[in-house]
Amino acid sequence: MQFVTEPHRISAIDDNGKWVGDISFPPVAGYPDRVVAERVFVAPEGRGHGLAAELTKRFVDYAYERHLTVKLMCPYVKAAFRDHPEYQDLLLPEDRFNQ
């Protein structure tokens, strides 16, 4: 599996060169240091192998490396942030989950 990082998207490509999923995170208009975790999608043939979790982790690393603030829209990513208190500092204070 290869992962291709582009501005505002990380894609997963299988060993045959076929796209099998991605996470998209467009910028928030007027805030160059903010992105919206819009969606994670994994094609049916890629499901059941932890790919959504891997894409989410790579997104979190991307956000930390670039000092981004994250707004949560995708239910999957929102659940990941809720389950990982260590991600909370990527969120605005009013968006953080009470632990």
Which stretches of residues belong to each language-model region?
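Conserved acetyl-CoA-binding loop-helix of GNAT-fold acetyltransferases
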Residues: 48-60
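A conserved beta-strand-loop-helix scaffold within acyl/acetyltransferase catalytic domains
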Residues: 6-11, 15-32
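Conserved N-terminal entry element of GNAT/NAT acetyltransferase domains
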Residues: 1-3
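A short, internal acetyl-CoA/4′-phosphopantetheine-binding micro-motif in the GNAT/acyltransferase core
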Residues: 40-47
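C-terminal structural segments of small proteins and small subunits
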Residues: 62-97
